[in-house]
C-alpha cells in the first residue's frame, strides 16, 4: 500500500496547499492513506476543530500533533472525542486526548503513534520507553505502523529510527519545517526520514512573516510571530510504500512541491 505523509501544515497557506495538491498526489501516486502533522494549522499555532475538519475535507485521513497541539483554548475537548487526531503520547497521562490511533484504508488497519522529542523541547516523558509499550500494543492490531516524532534534534530522530527499525513501517520527523534529504529504508524494513519539512508559505522564515523574526534576531524582542500570508506556497512530505501483510517498507520518496499559487 502507498501512504502519503505530509509535513507540518502551517496556517491558511498550508491548508490551501492541501486543498490544491493532496487529491492530485493521491491520484498520481495511487495513495491509499494520507497522514499529516497539523499542530500549526490554525494561525500557525495549534489546531481547532474547524481546521481539522478542513484538513479532512482536503483528503487527509489522520492528523498528528506536537508541542503546539494545545495552543488553542478548548481544543482538548475535541481531542478527547476525535478518533482521527492525536497528540504526542509522551505527554503526562492526564493530558487530553490520545497518543495513538488506528484507521482503515484499502481494507488495511493503519496504526499511528505520535511522539515528541526531549532535546531542545518542552519537558515530556521518555519517548523511547513510551514507544516500546505503545508499539507493542499497536502490533497486536496491525503490522502497519507509522510514527511521527516531533523533535528538534536530528540525532534524536535518527536514533528513534534505528531504535524502532523492524518494529514499525515508518518513522518520520516533524517540527523543524525544513525537509531533510536522508530518506531511506533501514535494514529491518522501516522507512525513515529525519524531517518531512513544511506545508505552508514559501516566503518568510519557516512559515512566519520575516519582519518580526528578524527583529527578534537583531534586537532580542519583537511582536508576536504571525503566518506569512502573501507569496507562493509549498507542500512537503513523502510517499511510503509498505507491504500490508508484513508491515515492512518497500520504499520511500520525498515530495516537495513549490510554486503553489
Model-predicted regions and their roles:
Residues 1-261:
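Acidic, metal/ion-coordinating pockets
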